[in-house]
């Protein structure tokens, strides 16, 4: 397992948004019982055996994927950044396969309330949520906010992590 020198994903400090790679509304393999799984983008490791390698780095905006998307779900904005239109995406992963950096451009910057709104749609059918990645503990403030919302709704919470966060520095996260 190699530790990266630089973490490429960073939360937007102004509004608390983090890069969300995907939300799986119903999962029976990401923890006990039926749950919603939330995958965040960015990791501080570069493991060869990574289960979700496309979640390690943020898109570098090289644009290699834009013309290759069969559904036109990717475009370059006026600032030269690759943008993603989830409504058009068919989930074929062409963008990931053609990326020279193995990144996924299919992220949405979301705050805890927006993610929980997606989770809440599944509440009658799930027992909890699992947040994974990438490395979800790169975003401890986001996790705390999301878990407060989930616990308040009676849902269990799990973190799927590489274990590098010093939880003693985040007692409020452990208290949730």
Where are the language model's segments positioned?
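Conserved Radical SAM active-site core
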Residues: 58-174
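N-terminal [4Fe-4S]-dependent radical SAM core
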Residues: 1-82, 101, 121-125
